[in-house]
């Protein structure tokens, strides 16, 4: 019971609600954790409290903790491990805590898919799957689906008298392809798999269309649409009532009042009918008759008021007319005929989906593979059993898990789907009032509905649970935000109190949902939130809508670039919490958030033009990259050289290097036949003298092509790719171009993709090319390879979805004027979890099609869900900001938009009217009307408070609201007047005019001599490695060293060498592993393999480097005395960079300059450990020792000491200077032979 829970300790930093979430027990608990409320810390503390509970401790492996991502699971484990280690410091003798640390790696702290995998691995014998199954990648899954579906449709086309199938084809395919039918089958398959019982859900789709013996009132679609009818009639009535108020003004058109009152009565009649039945509304709609307005002399009244009255009345009439046309132009029974007619066709469609699912599952089973939805359904199959009445009950295995888990904790619960919810239900106790399920999330941040997440699960429990937990589950609100300044939180609250409600938005943004200040910040300057609305330029855009979008992106990018540059240049300050002080803002403190990434390239370009470093992880553009495009054409030619366009592209590319004239010459040798045939014929003959160079180029390429084609038939695709890179030299070539590193990274990604493809059950170049073509046909793409680290000092551009869980000092939210993406609502067919299937009624014989009731209902439902999702996306965007929030949107006609937005000022309630919120087409349609009711918009509007209540008008938030003229952003910067004369002289190539008083200064500069000429022959900045080389006699001079750095002519690139990695590359790989190996985990082969695989995924290692790592040598180090000291040390620092000033004569043996000269030395220390008696420095070496020295290690030791003595002495000196502590020991560790060398002075 509540009174038995531990009291919050004195001086605790936990809030009361946080503490309640940490200690509450005895029932299912739902924690609604607002953005920045410290939910992860609460979750970890709850787990720790359970583990170290004195009265009833729980082993960590008796907890199931479900996270949304693998990264979150790992972070959770790390935090729990750190917390347990702190407990161990206070209780060093606690065997229980030591046991928990050893159990932590085996604990069930993972994603739901990892838990499902664990269950399946344990009980695979209950399923018809190979226990050696593997997880299919997306590539393989798509290819399998395509193959299965092609086979099924081919069979159906071959069946005689397959009448219903061909009717389905006639209705839902074009005369060119059956792609739409394929899309329908795949979409139904995917949607069905988001339900615990897919077949049951599919059967319900068909049942809904069986309307025999039913009336329209029995249909769920009609019931839902009646609610929408009431909503629209209410909107119309509000327009009329507002018009009536205006007509009653002293200068209003009073003669209109009588007509308006009749309008209210008419709408009241329609609303009453809507509360009765569909048939009643239909009949009432047939009798709608609007009275004619009485003529008035407009000069007798305020003309603007008359226009407003007439406009509002027309809006009301339009609402009714829309209902009449969409819903009530047809008799109710005609809608029923649509359903009856479509029923057999839908039945056939569902049958095809079931056959597809069965065949697809069988093919995966034969190939020993499963996908992620299989993991969920297989797990559910193990944990459930079906009763006689068809209900799903927990199986014996589920009951075992219920007994095992003392508590199940689910993070990001708002993103759970129906199948995952069922799995969780089967491993937790039945009763919510006595349950052991702890759920944490924020439904306001549920933004993954497109991945079939179901926020309704969270909302249902939030409404059902109480804060006291009486008679059911308990809910706890964590509303305090420890991330952001007051200005960010108050600004966000002000907007969402007005736009987010249950009817429109699915969530009541009430006092419990509001963000509350939890963080403390010093006073800051210019911290008010901002809305910058850009008025688009009036110039005609020649490229239509696409051109207008580009211009909007450019305008917003220029405005953001100006603001970022101004803030950085002016030293705008942000708070550094680590140092508890203000500091100048850096580029990495800025983020630009977008709903989607199409604008990102334009924004990047504009920022770069302003000299602002910027990075965006683009998910497009990979196949458009020139180097990738050329290589894909090479592979197309290898697969089939008879393709003219790919072959011409390769011949024209830098690989072969033909000019346009040479290409034309080749074509002239044979006007008929393919390019390949012409090339073959040309090479058989003797070339003319002027064609010898062309002949040589083509002969070189032709011979290579024949070799590649032969190689492709016998060897792997990935080996073919490296062979092409090597024999063409193209990989090296692109490395020398601008952005060479990026280009080479793109080519490496192509190789990696090929390796991943070959890891599937598919093989061969043809299938690989076909798959890539399917990707391009679908409009998909991959992002270019990442060539930038996450800690770089750059402005980041990312989607709002990618930003979830992150925070930034300064946040720009751009593109707020872009329309919501409603393409899904325009599809030929619609699917919904509750309403099933909806499409137009299509009659191919009569060649007619029209909207059906199911389509209208699903479209309306999806529109309202889209509106709710977009609200949540906006909430996520606004809550990423820590200190400064800047909102930017562009509109075509600011005055027109403002007139629309000003309607909100007439409403006195906090929540804006439903029709304003539901009618929004972009984020600005919510933000601007909200802010126009605040006093800070008065500088722009100059309208006064009017009828806006004080609590809204004077709400405690600070905003800057501004309309920016787009012309000022696109105007070129004015050239300074004093530069005009200079520019004119440069244009005409005349002598530059020089003022007489500056002639002497110019002369002095030209004749000046450097006073430290001796220092010019030695570099002022050296690495420790370079200094070490200077001390080796054979390389004592800089000139010799520089000579050594020069690359020999025609150096063979690595991918051409048979021997694989160089010694230096192997050493780099080993150092990377030693830097990242997790010292908190047991050092075993399995753990190291897992960590190395993770480094490959993060692009910290390549596949080749990973394969070269000798794991047993890494383990040998940690088994050595020195390695054990590392594991037991008080602290361990790895890859420690340093810079220090050093007297020049200490670095250069041949120094002849001034004695006071210094140089800057830089280096990286491999490992530094702090023990009780001091600091030990360790440098890892991968030099070859064994077999290189006849006298063995004893002979090698003095040579190695001499070779590395200077290096380690400099490392030690750097550490002693920075730490103010002596280094007690300097060690070299050689992996070859497991040798340790101590360096003595």
Swiss-Prot record:
Family matches, as InterPro entries: AddA, DNA_helicase_UvrD-like_C, DNA_helicase_UvrD/REP, P-loop_NTPase, PDDEXK-like_dom_sf, PDDEXK_AddAB-type, Restrct_endonuc-II-like, UvrD-like_ATP-bd
Source taxon at top rank: Bacteria
GO BP terms: double-strand break repair via homologous recombination; recombinational repair
Binding site for ATP: 33-40
One GO CC term, this protein: cytosol
Domain called UvrD-like helicase C-terminal: residue spans: 505-805
Gene3D superfamilies with a match to the protein in the record: 3.90.320.10, 6.10.250.2380, P-loop containing nucleotide triphosphate hydrolases
Enzyme Commission number(s): 3.1.-.-, 5.6.2.4
UniProt entry keywords in alphabetical sequence: ATP-binding, DNA damage, DNA repair, DNA-binding, Exonuclease, Helicase, Hydrolase, Isomerase, Nuclease, Nucleotide-binding
Entry cofactors: Mg(2+)
Reactions this protein catalyses: Couples ATP hydrolysis with the unwinding of duplex DNA by translocating in the 3'-5' direction; ATP + H2O = ADP + phosphate + H(+)
Location of the UvrD-like helicase ATP-binding domain: 12-485
Record-level Gene Ontology MF annotations: 3'-5' DNA helicase activity; 3'-5' exonuclease activity; ATP binding; ATP hydrolysis activity; double-stranded DNA binding
SUPFAM superfamilies assigned to the protein according to its UniProt record, in alphabetical order: P-loop containing nucleoside triphosphate hydrolases, Restriction endonuclease-like
Assembly notes: Heterodimer of AddA and AddB/RexB.
Similarity comment text for this entry: Belongs to the helicase family. AddA subfamily.
Annotated function: The heterodimer acts as both an ATP-dependent DNA helicase and an ATP-dependent, dual-direction single-stranded exonuclease. Recognizes the chi site generating a DNA molecule suitable for the initiation of homologous recombination. The AddA nuclease domain is required for chi fragment generation; this subunit has the helicase and 3' -> 5' nuclease activities.
HAMAP family reported for this sequence: AddA
Stated name of the protein: ATP-dependent helicase/nuclease subunit A
